[in-house]
Amino acid sequence: MKKSMPRLTAKNAISFQGYLPINGIQQWVQIEGQETTNPLLFIIHGGPASTYSMFTEATRFFSTTFTVVHWDQRGAGKTYLKQPVMPDNLQTLVNDGLALTKQLKGAFPGVQIVLLGSSIGSIIANLMVQQAESSFAAYIATEQMTSRSHQIAFNQTLFDSKKHVLKTAWLNKLPYAASTWSAKQIAQFTIFFALQHTDVPNMVTDLFIKNLLHAYGLNIKAWLAFCRGLIASRQAIQPELDSFDYNRLFSKTSIPFVVFQGSHDPITPTAATQAYFNQVQAPYKRMIIVPNSGHLCFFSNPKFFLAELTKQVTPLIS
């Protein structure tokens, strides 16, 4: 196994970066933890193709309590760099994620796996839970996507901007029914919303770009692969995402279900997430608002996230 990050100091620590064979292609995986018997935190990134493996500082912080697993999905990041193969559909990514889950179970026998789905990854991870629920000890949703996410965000922004003529005029250029928005219009609205909330970290400028430029060992070739993967993956599966039937998300699960929600999230606003959360039946469920954060709340406020994760989830799986 290729190792390009320094090992952690704990005796039973693990620090691995490399390609693993997953459903016919080589896919990039990073695993880092200070104790191999700790629960695994398997992170399903958003996007499409917005890899989180560059967030090494935040996830190294998480690795004090969990063994953190990052996976650059088919068509994303360093997996795209190795071979520019696109997913046929969302189920392809679900299948890949479940195949990697089996490998993790083999590599860490008897260790619990906590699945975390973020943004678009919350759709993929939700489907993974439905298709292999017994593989996971708990499901954590951050930036949970729902059918009403964009509409509620738009309605709230329009209300907040009613005293500002120019802002209202710009918003009125968008169709009122957010379900009809194109990917370009969604991106435009997200940028507009972020500019209205400068008191919280901006997903693009403060989180993605900063970490892309400073991630350990990330080079220009890998950076370009990240960008090209974003474009290619969007072309491949965005039509399915645009028409996704959110009734496919589970309404009942037999494992603990915890949601982390950014206090000022422009893409998955609190009201939309709360509505879905209220519908779900689970043996244990909790929704936690992450203060002073927008989208990617667990990277915006990693200390708060880890403290709450340890408090809410660790006792349930120990």
Can you say where each PLM-predicted feature lies in the sequence?
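Glycine-rich "HGGG/HGxG" loop immediately N-terminal to the catalytic nucleophile
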Residues: 52-53, 75-88
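Conserved acidic catalytic loop of the alpha/beta-hydrolase fold
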Residues: 92-112
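Conserved hydrolase catalytic core segment
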Residues: 110-153
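Alpha/beta-hydrolase
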Residues: 160, 165-248, 255
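Short beta-strand/loop motif that positions the catalytic acidic residue
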Residues: 253, 259-261, 265
